[in-house]
Amino acid sequence: PLARTALYGLGEDLHVAVWPGGEHNTRDITRFIAQEARSYVVSVSGLMRKEDFPTDTPHLPRILENAPPILANGGSCIAGPDGQWVVEPIVNQEGVFTATLDFNKVLEERQNFDPVGHYSRPDVTELMVNRKRQSVVTLKNDGSSIN
């Protein structure tokens, strides 16, 4: 929730979510995030079928022997700032879709609820975000740090 709050605080009007693949991820979460943020959410989700595996994949027969024809059914979609579908999840097929988004709806919905407006009580709480690039590994040699 805090990472999302940081994005909301930056004034995000369009959020792009990338999922490994499956309507089970996109159907509920996309609408929830859109309604919570009062922004548009585009969820992009992968489609994986048996025939999509390269033929030189190690142990391919073993991987696919009990697999269903579709391993990840996609589910790419767009939800509006009110949580309603602009484009419902597209499953079991590849495709490209487009939509025209009315960003005035974002402002209208934020009149109803603004997640980082006065409801967030900035007089009581504060979220600090460290935007400095972080290193995954810090090497230490004789007590000093080397990044």
Which sequence ranges carry the predicted segments?
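Serine/threonine-rich low-complexity intrinsically disordered regions
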Residues: R49, A99, R121-D123
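A short, polar/charged loop-to-alpha-helix boundary motif
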Residues: Q93-F113
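A sequence-level detector of short, solvent-exposed, charge-rich linear segments
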Residues: G22, T26, F53, L60, ...
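CN hydrolase (nitrilase-like) catalytic-core segments centered on the catalytic cysteine
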Residues: P1-F97
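Cysteine/selenocysteine-centered motifs that mediate thiol-based redox chemistry or coordinate metal-sulfur cofactors
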Residues: V106-N147
